[in-house]
Amino acid sequence: MDPEPEIEVALPPSARVVREESDRFFATHGRAKLFGARAVELVFIDGMHRFEFALRDFSNAEAWSAPSGTIVLHDCVPLVPASAAPERRTRFWVGDTWKAAFAIAKHRPDLRIRTILTPPSGLVVIRKLDPSSTLLRERFDAIVKELAGAEYPFEPGAWPPELHCVAADAEGLREALG
């Protein structure tokens, strides 16, 4: 789903692009209506470069996912701290989506989180999902308030331990998907 998708290649017949913002999509569509009895196995979240959106997208996507599924968050390991601000100040910008990864790690220790240090901004791989969990939705306002003014606290190479960073190679990928 994307309100303004920029797709430059032909998609297979089974692919479906929904021209809609994610909040509206999850509020107006039911998983069963779109997928029948099947749960979602893979979700890639590359949203609005704002942690509130990424956190809400994760929570909504997890509710649609299979427990064995995988959710991947993009733009959570900025190259430089200046690119991690909520408002764009640099040419290369990831926004404050990194906060969503920290919030998920802190509030959902039941999840398996591994971060692949892929250039230019990392991929957070989240497994062992619990589609019945409502914890992030229940704590959403408090989490947003807690992290609203937070600055990215790490320099390149000093990766956050709570995100369990792995190399962007075959071994790291096996670890992330393990």
Q: Each predicted region: which residue ranges?
A:
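Structural motif
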Residues: 9-10, 17, 34-35, 63, ...
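Conserved Rossmann-like nucleotide-binding pocket used by diverse enzymes
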Residues: 18, 44, 72
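A short helix-to-beta-strand connector/capping loop
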Residues: 11-15, 39, 109-111
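Short, flexible, glycine/charge-rich loop motifs used to bind or transfer phosphoryl groups or to couple energy/partner
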Residues: 5-8, 31-34, 60-61, 114
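A short acidic, Gly/Pro-enriched loop at the edge of an enzyme's catalytic core
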Residues: 29-43
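SAM cofactor-binding core of SAM-dependent methyltransferases
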Residues: 1-31, 77-80, 85
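Switch II (G3) loop of P-loop NTPases
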Residues: 46-49
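C-terminal substrate-binding/active-site "lid" region of AdoMet-derived donor-dependent transferases
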Residues: 52-178
